[in-house]
UniProtKB/Swiss-Prot annotation:
One example GO MF annotation: structural constituent of ribosome
Gene3D superfamilies assigned to the protein according to its UniProt record, in alphabetical order: 2.30.30.770
InterPro entries: Ribosomal_eL27, Ribosomal_eL27_CS, Ribosomal_eL27_KOW, Ribosomal_eL27_sf, Translation_prot_SH3-like_sf
Ribonucleoprotein in keyword set: yes
Organismal lineage: Eukaryota, Fungi, Dikarya, Ascomycota, Saccharomycotina
Protein name (record): Large ribosomal subunit protein eL27B
């Protein structure tokens, strides 16, 4: 079978706490691992999407409304719905790894790096579809 779930592919989580949230695959594990003996992927996604901003909003309001709350997680392939979109993950690829999930402090640091990368891309106006809430 062709490996189409590559790093950088955007997907939608269809099961669990983050169902309906958009994620980007950081590291795919097709064969599984000792701790997760099934095909899975390390993903970084958006838990809370940025709100809409208009011209009449002040600088404080704009700053507050453009905040993004990210999450990082190990997700089974069965719970991912891949899309045609891709996103550059080079900014945080080195930070999010299997070792990141061992200690909460490492996890928080990784989330901060992911948040910074996502907010920079959102401010630049790139990947607009990824930063909009999925309506269903």
């Amino acid at each position: 079978m062709a490996k189409f779930l590559k790093a950088g592919k955007v997907a939608v989580v269809v099961r669990g706490r983050y169902a309906g949230k958009k994620v980007v695959i950081v590291k795919p594990h097709d064969e599984g691992s000792k701790s997760h003996p099934f095909g899975h992927a390390l993903v970084a996604g958006i838990e809370r999407y940025p709100s809409k901003v208009t011209k009449k909003h002040g600088a404080k309001k704009v700053a507050k409304r453009t905040k993004i709350k990210p999450f990082i997680k190990v997700v089974n392939y069965n719970h991912l719905l891949p899309t045609r979109y891709t996103l550059d993950v080079e900014a945080f690829k080195s930070v999010v790894s299997t070792e990141t999930f061992e200690q909460p402090s490492q996890r928080e640091e990784a989330k901060k790096v992911v948040k910074k990368a996502f907010e920079e891309r959102h401010q630049a106006g790139k990947n607009q579809w990824f930063f909009s809430k999925l309506r269903f």
